[in-house]
A protein has these predicted regions:
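Active-site entrance/lid segments in N-terminal catalytic domains of soluble metabolic enzymes
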Residues: 1-131
Length: 131
């Protein structure tokens, strides 16, 4: 990829101008996002039913999903300590605000939101490092 300029998103500088898409359920998780970020791109974790591997997913889906946001981010960060890692969070999710707050608490570099208008997103990330 010689000659391609780095990608700049706010204060973030991405060595390779590649943003991995958020593919849920169970595709864009910590392992893939970490691998992409390790190679210099932006690794994206999808929060769509992210907690499907949690033991209480069937009985407490909301809590399982919120908890898995942190654990999947940690998995990605272990693979790419200095990489750019974010989340894809659909506005249409019932617990959108909670997903965003969990991603911010985990230390996400950025959040990509679609499936609706992310009107509340700037207020939810205000005062954090998350773009």
């Amino acid at each position: 990829m010689k000659g391609l300029p780095e990608l700049v998103i706010g204060d973030l500088k991405v060595k390779r101008p590649v943003i991995q898409g958020g593919m849920g359920v169970g595709v864009s998780l910590g392992q893939l996002a970490g691998a992409v970020a390790k190679e210099g791109g932006v690794g994206i974790i999808s929060t769509a039913q992210i907690g499907f591997r949690e033991p209480d997913f069937e009985t407490n889906t909301r809590a399982a999903n919120i908890r898995a946001i942190g654990s999947e981010f940690q998995r990605a960060r272990e693979t790419a300590p200095d990489g750019v890692i974010g989340f894809n969070i659909m506005v249409a999710l019932k617990d959108y605000d909670e997903h965003v707050k969990a991603a911010v608490d985990a230390g996400a570099d950025l959040i990509v939101s679609g499936a609706g208008l992310p009107i509340e997103l700037p207020g939810l990330v205000e005062g954090s490092i998350t773009l």
